[in-house]
């Protein structure tokens, strides 16, 4: 009983000191039973058995007729025991949760390790994939190269096929060159006794040769000319391939189309040509005779060129504009002299107009443009030769149309002067055109000369 009052039980539950103050023997028995129950059942029974035991003890105490204070104490004990049981349950739940958490962490750690182990072989797989890709690319490149090589080989074979034909053509040309060289040797042997005759032909030609008489190249050049002439006779050349050259520089032409004299002092090695070039020479026999025929044609055609088209044009112009009365303009062949003469004639005609209209009013002739704008100058010039045609004093400078009409109509009727100027044009222009006025005055002068009203030095 002493242990239950102030000390704690083995399972950690404390007994309140009120249990020791209980005066009733029933209550003391209940306390003892409770203590014994706590000691005996703490190790074996769980919280549920403990609660049932307490309920039984309470019921017994109730049946024994204990006091209400004891009932309250029992209720408190029940609640304490239930709270402890709940705390134990919670502690066990916490322990179970901790265990579950530990198991989860271990499982997670195992999974992490598994993942690490799984991730470790990934670089190897990537490497294998890359190697496979590289191998496939290399195979493709090799296939392309082999295809290109095969194509190139096929092209080379195709190109190499016509080569035998070319070789055959080259052999044919070599054979032709050999035969031509043999023919040339025969021609040279035949040409040696004929050299004097050829020299006689060349000396008889009219062409001039600028070669020194004692130079050693002269004989070689003469021999080459002879050979070229004889080769032209032996080897025919088509006129389409070798047209005649229009140049007249020497008696014969070399294979290059130049005369041997034009080369000057050339060495024998430089002047000699290959056998393939010699047969194609466009030389023809006796070219000096053709040149003789051509030379007179040029001499005859030179003086037959037409001369003096300008003189004919001048005559036509002077006949049209009445320049015959003006004098020696057609005699000038130099353009500068002709221009000076025309300027002199123009000035002379201007001075003549001034002299004819000197005493007339409203007339001051200084040129062939503005001085004739009012029409009074035309009227004064015509009134000078035909004073009975109209009264000059009645004319008004402001009436331009009347003045032009009177002057042109009177000149046409009395002097047979063509009306080269239009009245409307003269009225429309404030300053008349000098060329038009000069042409009309020139025509009027010619008409007056034909009428005998103006005397010239020639007549």
Swiss-Prot record:
Region of interest called Disordered, as start-end residue ranges on this chain: 1-314
Coiled coil (residue ranges): 124-154
Subcellular location(s) per record: Cytoplasm, Myofibril, Sarcomere, I band; Cytoplasm, Myofibril, Sarcomere, M line; Nucleus
Highest taxon, organism lineage: Eukaryota
Keyword Mitochondrion in annotation: no
Pfam families: CH
Domain (Calponin-homology (CH)) ranges: 343-449
Chief localisation class: cytoplasm
Record region (Calmodulin-binding): 441-459
Organ and tissue specificity: Widely expressed, with highest expression in skeletal muscles (at protein level). Within striated muscles, significantly more expressed in soleus muscle compared with plantaris muscle or white vastus (at protein level). 30-40% lower expression in females than in males (at protein level). Expressed in type 2a fibers, but not detected in fast twitch type 2b muscle white vastus nor in oxidative type I/b heart muscle (at protein level). Expressed within myometrial cells of the uterus, as well as in the endometrial layer. In the aorta, confined to smooth muscle cells.
Induction cue: Significantly reduced by exercise in smooth and in skeletal muscles.
One MF annotation (Gene Ontology) recorded for this entry: tropomyosin binding
PTM comment: Maximal phosphorylation of Ser-301 correlates with maximal relaxation of aorta in response to acetylcholine.
GO biological processes: muscle organ morphogenesis; negative regulation of DNA-templated transcription; positive regulation of vasoconstriction; response to activity; response to xenobiotic stimulus; vasoconstriction
Subunit structure: Interacts with PPP1R12A.
Family: Belongs to the smoothelin family.
Function summary: Plays a role in the regulation of contractile properties of both striated and smooth muscles. When unphosphorylated, may inhibit myosin dephosphorylation. Phosphorylation at Ser-301 reduces this inhibitory activity.
Protein name, entry field: Smoothelin-like protein 1
Organism name: Mus musculus (Mouse)
Gene assigned in the entry: Smtnl1
């Amino acid at each position: 009983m002493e242990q239950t009052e102030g000390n704690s039980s083995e399972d950690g539950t404390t007994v309140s000191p009120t249990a020791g103050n209980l005066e009733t023997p029933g209550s003391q028995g209940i306390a003892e039973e409770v203590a014994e129950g706590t000691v005996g059942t703490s190790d074996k029974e769980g919280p549920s058995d403990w609660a049932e035991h307490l309920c039984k003890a309470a019921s017994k105490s109730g049946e024994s007729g204990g006091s209400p204070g004891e009932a309250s104490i029992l209720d408190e004990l029940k609640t304490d025991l239930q709270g402890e049981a709940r705390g134990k349950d919670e502690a066990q739940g916490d322990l179970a949760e901790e265990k579950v958490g530990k198991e989860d962490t271990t499982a997670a750690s195992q999974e992490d390790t598994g993942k690490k182990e799984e991730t470790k072989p990934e670089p190897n797989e990537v490497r294998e994939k890359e190697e496979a890709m590289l191998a496939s690319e290399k195979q493709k490149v090799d296939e392309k190269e082999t295809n290109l090589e095969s194509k190139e080989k096929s092209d080379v074979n195709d190109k190499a096929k016509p080569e035998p034909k070319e070789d055959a053509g080259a052999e044919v040309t070599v054979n032709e060159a050999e035969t031509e060289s043999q023919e040339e040797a025969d021609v040279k042997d035949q040409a040696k006794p004929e050299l004097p005759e050829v020299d006689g032909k060349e000396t008889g030609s009219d062409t001039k040769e600028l070669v020194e008489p004692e130079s050693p190249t002269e004989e070689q050049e003469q021999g080459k000319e002879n050979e070229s002439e004889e080769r032209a006779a032996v080897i025919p050349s088509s006129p389409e391939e070798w047209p005649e050259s229009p140049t007249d520089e020497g008696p014969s032409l070399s294979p290059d189309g130049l005369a041997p004299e034009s080369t000057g002092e050339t060495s024998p090695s430089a002047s000699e040509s290959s056998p393939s070039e010699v047969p194609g020479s466009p030389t023809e026999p006796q070219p000096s005779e053709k040149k003789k025929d051509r030379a007179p044609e040029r001499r005859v055609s030179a003086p037959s060129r037409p001369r003096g088209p300008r003189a004919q044009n001048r005559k036509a112009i002077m006949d049209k504009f009445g320049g015959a009365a003006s004098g020696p303009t057609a005699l000038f062949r130099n353009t500068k002299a002709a221009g000076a003469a025309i300027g002199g004639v123009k000035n002379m005609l201007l001075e003549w107009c001034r002299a004819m209209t000197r005493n007339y009013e409203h007339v001051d002739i200084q040129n062939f443009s503005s001085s004739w704008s009012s029409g009074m100058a035309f009227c004064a010039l015509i009134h000078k030769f035909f004073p009975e045609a109209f009264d000059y004093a009645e004319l008004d400078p402001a009436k331009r149309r009347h003045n032009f009409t009177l002057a042109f109509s009177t000149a046409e009727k009395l002097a047979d002067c063509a009306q080269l100027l239009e009245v409307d044009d003269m009225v429309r222009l404030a300053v008349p055109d000098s060329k038009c006025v000069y042409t009309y005055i020139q025509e009027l002068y010619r008409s007056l000369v034909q009428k005998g009203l103006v005397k010239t030095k020639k007549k």
